[in-house]
UniProtKB/Swiss-Prot annotation:
The record marks 29, 250 as: Transition state stabilizer. This is Acetylglutamate kinase. Belongs to the acetylglutamate kinase family. ArgB subfamily. Pathway: Amino-acid biosynthesis; L-arginine biosynthesis; N(2)-acetyl-L-ornithine from L-glutamate: step 2/4. It catalyses: N-acetyl-L-glutamate + ATP = N-acetyl-L-glutamyl 5-phosphate + ADP. GO terms for biological process: arginine biosynthetic process via ornithine; L-arginine biosynthetic process.
Length: 292
C-alpha cells in the first residue's frame, strides 16, 4: 500500500508542471550515452511520447559524433579539430551527411515511432529548415593575436524555417532534426547539434531548451552540482575556470537561447533513465536549470 501511495504522491508532485507546460514547446538536444545504450534509448523515447501525450510540443535535435567517427575511421579519413569542432572538407562532409541524415536520424525516428510516436525525420536541407552560412572560428595564437580559421563545411544557422515545424506540430507530428544545414547555393554544412537546438528553440520561442549530456550538469568550483544558475553566475564560473572544456559551448548556447526569448534552459544527465521527466516534473530535478 505504501508504494501505491508513493506513486500517487509522485503524480501529485507532477500535476502543477503538467498544467503549466501543456501547449508549450520543448526543444530537446539528444546525444551522448543516451543514444547508444538500449535501455536509455527506450527511456528517452518513452519520455518524449509522455510529453506529447500531456500536450507538450517536443522538437528533437540529435547529435551523432561517435557514429561519424566510426564511419570516418572505416573510410580511413582522419579529422582535425579546432575548439572541439571538426574541420570538415568535402569528403568528410559527405560522410557526416550520410551518417547524420541517412543513419542516425532514421534510427531515432524509428524507435520513437516504435513506442507510439509520430516522428518525422528532417535535415536542415528539407524545406530549407536550417538556412546556414560558413562558420569562421576565432583562434588565439601563442602570441596573443586572434585569427579566423576556415573550418571548411562547418556552419552556423542564419534562419530557421518555423513554418515547416509549425505545420508538423499542427499535424500532431514530432520533428526529429539532423544538424545538417543548407547554404545559399545548396551546399551542406555540418553544424554543432547544441547550436542547432538553441537556434531552433529561440526561433520557436520555446518554453524550454533541454540538452542531454554525459555529465550530471553544471558544477561549481568545489565540484558540487548546481540545480539552478543565473546567466550572470554562469559567466562568472567560466571566468573562474569552474566551467571548462566542452561544457563552455553548451552553457553559452543556453545563455544565447535565453537572451533570444527561450524561457529556461536545462543541462541534464542523459545517462539517467527518464532524465527528461525527472528534470521537468519533479520539484528538485536532476540537472542544472539555467535562467536569466
Amino acid at each position: 500500500m505504501e508504494k501505491l501511495i508513493e506513486k500517487a504522491n509522485n503524480l501529485m508532485e507532477a500535476l502543477p508542471y503538467i498544467r503549466r507546460f501543456a501547449g508549450k514547446t520543448f526543444v530537446i538536444k539528444y546525444g551522448g550515452h543516451a543514444m547508444s545504450d538500449e535501455k536509455l534509448k527506450e527511456s528517452f523515447a518513452l519520455d518524449v511520447i509522455m510529453l506529447r501525450s500531456l500536450g507538450i510540443n517536443a522538437v528533437i535535435v540529435h547529435g551523432g559524433g561517435p557514429q561519424i567517427n566510426q564511419t570516418l575511421k572505416r573510410y580511413g579519413i582522419v579529422s582535425q579539430f579546432v575548439k572541439g569542432m571538426r574541420v570538415t572538407d568535402s569528403e568528410t562532409m559527405a560522410v557526416v551527411e550520410m551518417v547524420l541524415v541517412g543513419q542516425v536520424n532514421k534510427e531515432v525516428v524509428g524507435y520513437l515511432n516504435q513506442h507510439g510516436g509520430r516522428a518525422v525525420g528532417l535535415s536542415g536541407k528539407d524545406g530549407t529548415l536550417l538556412l546556414s552560412k560558413k562558420l569562421l572560428q576565432d583562434v588565439v595564437g601563442d602570441d596573443g593575436t586572434t585569427e579566423q580559421v576556415d573550418m571548411g563545411y562547418v556552419g552556423d544557422v542564419v534562419k530557421v524555417n518555423t513554418d515547416l515545424l509549425k505545420a508538423l506540430e499542427n499535424g500532431n507530428y514530432l520533428p526529429v532534426i539532423a544538424p545538417v544545414g543548407v547554404g545559399p547555393q545548396g551546399e551542406s554544412y555540418n553544424i554543432n547539434a547544441d547550436l542547432v537546438a538553441g537556434r531552433v528553440a529561440a526561433a520557436l520561442n520555446a518554453e524550454k531548451l533541454i540538452l542531454l549530456t554525459d555529465i550530471e550538469g553544471v558544477k561549481d568550483k568545489a565540484g558540487q552540482l548546481l540545480s539552478s544558475i543565473a546567466v550572470a553566475d554562469m559567466h562568472r564560473l567560466i571566468r573562474e575556470e569552474a566551467i571548462t572544456g566542452g561544457m563552455i559551448p553548451k552553457v553559452v548556447c543556453c545563455a544565447d537561447a535565453l537572451e533570444e526569448g527561450v524561457k529556461k534552459a536545462h543541462i541534464i544527465d542523459g545517462r539517467v533513465e527518464h532524465a527528461v521527466l525527472l528534470e521537468i516534473f519533479t520539484d528538485v530535478g536532476i540537472g542544472t536549470e539555467i535562467q536569466k
